[in-house]
Amino acid sequence: MTTYTNADLHCHSVVSDGTLEPEALAARAKANGVELWALTDHDEVGGQQRAAAAARAQGMAYLTGAEISVTFAGTTVHIVGLGFDAQDERLLQGLARTRGGRGERAQEMAEQLAKVGIPGAYEGALHYVGNPELISRTHFARYLVEAGVCKDTSEVFRKFLIEGKPGFVPHRWASLGDAVRWIQDAGGVAVIAHPARYRLSANEEFALFSEFKQHGGQGVEVVTGSHSAAEAVSYAAMAQEFGFAASRGSDFHSPDESHTDLGMLPPLPGHLTPVWDLLAHRIQPAH
Protein backbone atom coordinates (compact mmCIF):
# COMPACT_ATOMS: atom_id res chain seq x y z
CA MET A 1 0.00 0.00 0.00
CA THR A 2 1.39 3.41 -0.99
CA THR A 3 2.17 5.82 1.84
CA TYR A 4 1.38 9.51 1.30
CA THR A 5 3.09 12.11 3.46
CA ASN A 6 1.21 15.04 1.90
CA ALA A 7 -2.43 14.42 0.97
CA ASP A 8 -4.93 17.26 0.53
CA LEU A 9 -8.45 15.92 0.20
CA HIS A 10 -10.56 19.07 0.51
CA CYS A 11 -10.54 22.10 -1.81
CA HIS A 12 -12.81 24.02 -4.17
CA SER A 13 -12.63 25.30 -7.75
CA VAL A 14 -14.67 27.75 -9.82
CA VAL A 15 -17.11 24.89 -10.38
CA SER A 16 -18.47 25.78 -6.92
CA ASP A 17 -17.18 28.65 -4.77
CA GLY A 18 -13.44 28.61 -5.37
CA THR A 19 -11.66 31.13 -7.58
CA LEU A 20 -9.23 28.87 -9.47
CA GLU A 21 -9.81 26.45 -12.33
CA PRO A 22 -9.19 22.75 -11.54
CA GLU A 23 -5.97 22.83 -13.58
CA ALA A 24 -4.63 25.81 -11.61
CA LEU A 25 -5.48 24.07 -8.34
CA ALA A 26 -3.62 20.97 -9.45
CA ALA A 27 -0.54 23.02 -10.35
CA ARG A 28 -0.67 24.83 -7.00
CA ALA A 29 -1.07 21.56 -5.11
CA LYS A 30 1.91 20.03 -6.92
CA ALA A 31 4.04 23.12 -6.25
CA ASN A 32 3.25 22.73 -2.54
CA GLY A 33 4.33 19.11 -2.48
CA VAL A 34 0.94 17.39 -2.54
CA GLU A 35 1.18 13.72 -3.52
CA LEU A 36 -2.51 12.72 -3.26
CA TRP A 37 -5.20 15.25 -4.13
CA ALA A 38 -8.98 15.51 -4.31
CA LEU A 39 -11.16 18.31 -5.66
CA THR A 40 -14.29 18.51 -3.48
CA ASP A 41 -16.63 21.11 -4.95
CA HIS A 42 -19.91 21.78 -3.17
CA ASP A 43 -22.72 19.45 -4.28
CA GLU A 44 -21.16 19.09 -7.73
CA VAL A 45 -18.86 16.72 -9.62
CA GLY A 46 -18.63 18.71 -12.85
CA GLY A 47 -14.92 19.39 -12.37
CA GLN A 48 -13.86 15.83 -11.62
CA GLN A 49 -12.73 14.78 -15.09
CA ARG A 50 -10.61 17.91 -15.49
CA ALA A 51 -9.16 17.57 -12.00
CA ALA A 52 -8.20 13.93 -12.50
CA ALA A 53 -6.52 14.73 -15.83
CA ALA A 54 -4.69 17.69 -14.29
CA ALA A 55 -3.50 15.55 -11.38
CA ARG A 56 -2.07 13.00 -13.82
CA ALA A 57 -0.37 15.74 -15.79
CA GLN A 58 1.21 17.04 -12.58
CA GLY A 59 2.28 13.59 -11.39
CA MET A 60 -0.11 13.42 -8.43
CA ALA A 61 -2.38 10.57 -7.38
CA TYR A 62 -6.07 11.50 -7.35
CA LEU A 63 -9.32 10.66 -5.56
CA THR A 64 -12.73 11.84 -6.75
CA GLY A 65 -14.45 14.12 -4.27
CA ALA A 66 -17.45 16.29 -3.42
CA GLU A 67 -18.61 18.19 -0.35
CA ILE A 68 -22.31 17.60 0.26
CA SER A 69 -24.40 20.00 2.33
CA VAL A 70 -26.71 18.28 4.81
CA THR A 71 -29.12 19.41 7.49
CA PHE A 72 -28.59 17.85 10.91
CA ALA A 73 -30.62 18.96 13.93
CA GLY A 74 -31.29 22.32 12.30
CA THR A 75 -27.60 22.91 11.50
CA THR A 76 -25.89 22.80 8.11
CA VAL A 77 -23.13 20.19 8.18
CA HIS A 78 -20.80 19.22 5.33
CA ILE A 79 -20.00 15.64 4.36
CA VAL A 80 -17.04 15.03 2.06
CA GLY A 81 -17.35 12.04 -0.24
CA LEU A 82 -14.11 10.52 -1.52
CA GLY A 83 -13.25 7.84 -4.05
CA PHE A 84 -16.72 7.40 -5.54
CA ASP A 85 -17.79 6.80 -9.13
CA ALA A 86 -18.41 10.35 -10.37
CA GLN A 87 -20.85 9.04 -13.00
CA ASP A 88 -23.07 7.12 -10.57
CA GLU A 89 -26.64 8.02 -11.51
CA ARG A 90 -28.10 8.04 -7.99
CA LEU A 91 -25.28 10.25 -6.74
CA LEU A 92 -25.76 12.67 -9.64
CA GLN A 93 -29.51 12.83 -9.04
CA GLY A 94 -29.00 13.44 -5.33
CA LEU A 95 -26.51 16.23 -5.92
CA ALA A 96 -28.85 17.85 -8.46
CA ARG A 97 -31.65 17.86 -5.88
CA THR A 98 -29.31 19.35 -3.29
CA ARG A 99 -28.29 22.14 -5.68
CA GLY A 100 -31.92 22.90 -6.44
CA GLY A 101 -33.28 25.99 -4.77
CA ARG A 102 -29.98 27.87 -4.55
CA GLY A 103 -31.16 30.38 -7.16
CA GLU A 104 -34.36 31.15 -5.28
CA ARG A 105 -32.43 31.48 -2.03
CA ALA A 106 -29.98 33.87 -3.70
CA GLN A 107 -32.83 36.09 -4.88
CA GLU A 108 -34.21 36.18 -1.33
CA MET A 109 -30.78 37.05 0.04
CA ALA A 110 -30.50 39.94 -2.40
CA GLU A 111 -33.94 41.22 -1.41
CA GLN A 112 -32.98 41.15 2.26
CA LEU A 113 -29.70 42.95 1.58
CA ALA A 114 -31.51 45.61 -0.46
CA LYS A 115 -33.68 46.34 2.59
CA VAL A 116 -30.57 47.30 4.56
CA GLY A 117 -29.21 49.57 1.83
CA ILE A 118 -27.24 47.16 -0.37
CA PRO A 119 -28.99 47.03 -3.77
CA GLY A 120 -27.89 44.95 -6.75
CA ALA A 121 -26.30 42.18 -4.71
CA TYR A 122 -27.71 39.35 -6.83
CA GLU A 123 -26.34 40.78 -10.06
CA GLY A 124 -23.05 41.56 -8.33
CA ALA A 125 -22.72 38.04 -6.94
CA LEU A 126 -23.35 36.56 -10.38
CA HIS A 127 -20.09 38.10 -11.63
CA TYR A 128 -18.25 35.69 -9.32
CA VAL A 129 -20.23 32.56 -10.18
CA GLY A 130 -18.58 29.91 -12.32
CA ASN A 131 -21.59 27.59 -12.13
CA PRO A 132 -25.02 29.34 -11.95
CA GLU A 133 -26.52 26.32 -10.16
CA LEU A 134 -24.12 26.89 -7.27
CA ILE A 135 -24.53 30.57 -6.41
CA SER A 136 -23.71 30.78 -2.72
CA ARG A 137 -23.11 33.09 0.22
CA THR A 138 -19.42 33.19 -0.70
CA HIS A 139 -20.23 34.80 -4.05
CA PHE A 140 -22.31 37.47 -2.27
CA ALA A 141 -19.44 38.00 0.18
CA ARG A 142 -16.96 38.61 -2.64
CA TYR A 143 -19.29 41.17 -4.23
CA LEU A 144 -19.81 43.02 -0.94
CA VAL A 145 -16.04 43.31 -0.53
CA GLU A 146 -15.73 44.62 -4.10
CA ALA A 147 -18.51 47.12 -3.40
CA GLY A 148 -16.64 48.42 -0.35
CA VAL A 149 -19.27 47.32 2.15
CA CYS A 150 -16.74 45.27 4.13
CA LYS A 151 -12.96 44.86 4.11
CA ASP A 152 -12.95 41.08 3.63
CA THR A 153 -15.27 38.12 3.23
CA SER A 154 -15.01 37.14 6.90
CA GLU A 155 -16.46 40.51 7.89
CA VAL A 156 -19.28 40.08 5.35
CA PHE A 157 -20.27 36.76 6.87
CA ARG A 158 -20.17 38.14 10.42
CA LYS A 159 -22.27 41.19 9.58
CA PHE A 160 -24.66 39.93 6.92
CA LEU A 161 -24.62 36.24 6.01
CA ILE A 162 -24.84 34.11 9.16
CA GLU A 163 -28.03 33.14 10.96
CA GLY A 164 -29.70 36.15 12.55
CA LYS A 165 -28.12 38.66 10.15
CA PRO A 166 -30.03 40.50 7.38
CA GLY A 167 -28.70 38.54 4.39
CA PHE A 168 -29.10 35.04 5.81
CA VAL A 169 -31.72 32.81 4.20
CA PRO A 170 -31.87 29.15 5.29
CA HIS A 171 -31.92 26.32 2.79
CA ARG A 172 -33.05 22.74 3.19
CA TRP A 173 -30.17 20.47 2.26
CA ALA A 174 -29.89 16.69 1.96
CA SER A 175 -30.34 14.49 5.02
CA LEU A 176 -27.27 12.98 6.66
CA GLY A 177 -28.42 9.48 5.76
CA ASP A 178 -29.04 10.41 2.12
CA ALA A 179 -25.59 11.92 1.67
CA VAL A 180 -23.79 8.94 3.19
CA ARG A 181 -25.87 6.52 1.12
CA TRP A 182 -25.21 8.34 -2.15
CA ILE A 183 -21.46 8.26 -1.48
CA GLN A 184 -21.37 4.63 -0.37
CA ASP A 185 -23.60 3.36 -3.16
CA ALA A 186 -21.19 5.01 -5.61
CA GLY A 187 -18.26 3.12 -4.06
CA GLY A 188 -16.86 5.94 -1.93
CA VAL A 189 -16.20 6.79 1.71
CA ALA A 190 -18.08 9.51 3.62
CA VAL A 191 -16.16 11.90 5.90
CA ILE A 192 -17.41 14.59 8.31
CA ALA A 193 -15.79 17.84 7.13
CA HIS A 194 -14.18 20.34 9.56
CA PRO A 195 -16.30 19.34 12.60
CA ALA A 196 -15.08 22.19 14.81
CA ARG A 197 -16.68 24.71 12.44
CA TYR A 198 -20.20 23.77 13.51
CA ARG A 199 -19.76 24.88 17.13
CA LEU A 200 -21.98 22.07 18.37
CA SER A 201 -22.38 21.28 22.05
CA ALA A 202 -20.70 18.10 23.29
CA ASN A 203 -24.05 16.28 23.24
CA GLU A 204 -24.92 17.53 19.75
CA GLU A 205 -21.52 16.54 18.42
CA PHE A 206 -21.77 13.07 19.95
CA ALA A 207 -25.20 12.71 18.33
CA LEU A 208 -23.81 13.77 14.93
CA PHE A 209 -20.91 11.33 15.10
CA SER A 210 -23.16 8.53 16.35
CA GLU A 211 -25.80 8.98 13.66
CA PHE A 212 -23.13 9.38 10.98
CA LYS A 213 -21.61 6.06 12.02
CA GLN A 214 -25.04 4.38 12.11
CA HIS A 215 -25.59 5.45 8.50
CA GLY A 216 -22.23 3.97 7.49
CA GLY A 217 -19.96 7.01 7.66
CA GLN A 218 -16.31 6.04 8.00
CA GLY A 219 -14.16 9.13 8.41
CA VAL A 220 -13.65 12.56 9.95
CA GLU A 221 -11.40 15.47 8.99
CA VAL A 222 -8.90 15.67 11.82
CA VAL A 223 -6.42 18.04 10.19
CA THR A 224 -8.04 20.83 8.18
CA GLY A 225 -7.50 24.50 7.48
CA SER A 226 -9.88 25.77 10.16
CA HIS A 227 -8.78 23.44 12.98
CA SER A 228 -6.38 24.59 15.66
CA ALA A 229 -3.73 22.20 16.95
CA ALA A 230 -5.88 21.55 20.03
CA GLU A 231 -8.93 20.82 17.88
CA ALA A 232 -6.92 18.37 15.78
CA VAL A 233 -5.94 16.53 18.97
CA SER A 234 -9.57 16.49 20.12
CA TYR A 235 -10.87 15.08 16.84
CA ALA A 236 -8.06 12.55 16.68
CA ALA A 237 -9.39 11.23 19.98
CA MET A 238 -12.95 11.19 18.63
CA ALA A 239 -11.81 9.37 15.50
CA GLN A 240 -10.38 6.66 17.74
CA GLU A 241 -13.48 6.57 19.92
CA PHE A 242 -15.81 6.06 16.96
CA GLY A 243 -13.47 3.91 14.89
CA PHE A 244 -13.23 6.50 12.10
CA ALA A 245 -10.42 6.90 9.62
CA ALA A 246 -8.80 10.34 9.62
CA SER A 247 -8.75 12.76 6.71
CA ARG A 248 -6.59 15.78 5.93
CA GLY A 249 -7.62 18.72 3.76
CA SER A 250 -6.97 22.44 3.55
CA ASP A 251 -10.48 23.51 2.45
CA PHE A 252 -8.67 25.87 0.09
CA HIS A 253 -10.89 28.24 -1.90
CA SER A 254 -8.76 31.17 -3.05
CA PRO A 255 -5.23 32.58 -2.71
CA ASP A 256 -6.78 35.81 -1.39
CA GLU A 257 -9.23 34.31 1.10
CA SER A 258 -8.04 30.98 2.45
CA HIS A 259 -6.04 30.84 5.69
CA THR A 260 -4.35 27.58 4.68
CA ASP A 261 -2.83 26.91 1.28
CA LEU A 262 -3.09 23.59 -0.52
CA GLY A 263 -0.94 20.95 1.16
CA MET A 264 0.35 23.32 3.86
CA LEU A 265 -1.00 21.36 6.81
CA PRO A 266 0.40 19.47 9.79
CA PRO A 267 0.63 15.69 9.33
CA LEU A 268 -2.07 13.35 10.57
CA PRO A 269 -1.32 11.81 13.98
CA GLY A 270 0.56 8.59 13.29
CA HIS A 271 -1.71 6.37 15.38
CA LEU A 272 -4.75 7.04 13.18
CA THR A 273 -5.80 5.18 10.03
CA PRO A 274 -5.62 7.60 7.07
CA VAL A 275 -8.84 7.63 5.07
CA TRP A 276 -6.89 6.93 1.89
CA ASP A 277 -5.97 3.52 3.29
CA LEU A 278 -9.67 2.63 2.94
CA LEU A 279 -9.58 3.78 -0.69
CA ALA A 280 -6.38 2.23 -2.04
CA HIS A 281 -8.38 0.51 -4.78
CA ARG A 282 -10.05 3.81 -5.77
CA ILE A 283 -6.95 6.00 -6.00
CA GLN A 284 -6.10 7.04 -9.55
CA PRO A 285 -2.31 6.64 -9.87
CA ALA A 286 0.02 9.55 -10.51
CA HIS A 287 1.05 8.29 -13.96
Model-derived regions: residue spans:
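Catalytic core of soluble alpha/beta enzymes
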Residues: 229, 250-287
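A general, composition-driven signal for non-globular sequence regions
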Residues: 4-6, 93-96, 240-242, 267-270
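Extended substrate/RNA-proximal surfaces in nucleic-acid metabolism proteins
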Residues: 54-210, 271-287
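Residue-level detector of alpha-helical segments with a strong bias toward transmembrane helices
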Residues: 20, 127, 158, 259-261
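An N-terminally biased module of ancient metal coordination in phosphate/nucleic-acid-related enzymes
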Residues: 1-75, 161-162, 174-175, 180-182, ...
